[in-house]
Amino acid sequence: MYEKLTRKQANRLEQQTLRVSVFTIVGLAIAGIGFGLYIGSEAVMLDGFYALTSLLGSGLYLLAAKVVERPADRHFQYGYAHIEPLVNSFNNLILLIVCLYALFNGLEGLRTGGNPVDVGNVVLYSVLSAAVCAAVWIYERRVAARSDSQLIRNDAREWMISMGFSIVTVLGFAMVWVLPEPYRSWWARYADSGVVALMALLL
């Protein structure tokens, strides 16, 4: 059992946690987009772009955490609690746009003959990304349980989705190492586009 926090303590912990989330996302976004461009992998770049949408979401959650603690005023006589569902709705809309764009790119890649990439590099990046996402997810779940913060729960859910994306990417590309020929060569060419399309549907 966690010691019960005052509202002020919970809000301070909430903001500190969201700052950690934002800084971590910045690192993942830069790494994903930069490394994805370097090795030519759309799946890794999608991981980076998804991190960018998460950055926007976490930034909005942090802003909401600061706004919600304000007392009611003459413009908002019932306080600012309504800000949280608005932020959630906006984040879901951004995620939908990213998924549709990724699905289009993935299907286009499949249609045009795939995109062969270095499987080892993709798997290495995705394993590291999954480990980072898992660490932040576990951390935020504990903070959410202690502070009873819906904003942290929502942000933790996004980290869980990111972790799932990385795990599916690892499994999808690792199949190249276990499939017999001629399936290995075929999947090596289509794995990148196929994983992008699959993740767009799952997200």
Can you describe what each PLM-predicted range is?
Residues 2-20, 39, 43, 47-203:
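Alpha-helical transmembrane segments and adjacent TM-loop junctions that form the membrane-embedded core
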Residues 19-32:
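The first (N-terminal) embedded transmembrane alpha-helix
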Residues 35-36:
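Hydrophobic alpha-helical transmembrane segments
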